[in-house]
């Protein structure tokens, strides 16, 4: 997991795929709070973005997700949310990994969870197999969130 500010994205450019990663960041920068929700493809099967609007959940309703094929780079365009990194060893699986959706789910266990507060201007990266629980309301501002999840195929980091 990486949590940082968008102005510092250059620290994380994978050397072998710098061109694709830089294209992905430029793609990400084009999204605004007025961007249309849905899937936006930059490089077929390598880089796409899911833009979504929602009201974050209460912590008690959260579930831990993980992926095997895609890295998540998550940032909010409007609003704020809490997001957690959660080691998956020892967690209870509640939905087996589905290759078609590149997602599996575990029950949340706060014992080893690492918290990150997501606001416009910062981002978090979750690598394949890293458990994460997004979309959790921030107590100070539980309002609607507009978010981009940039999906980067794992091969870009190999």
Which residue stretches match the model-derived regions?
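A short, N-terminal "cap"/entry segment at the start of jelly-roll beta-barrel domains
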Residues: 1-51, 63
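A short hydrophobic beta-strand segment most commonly corresponding to one strand
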Residues: 123-125, 141-158
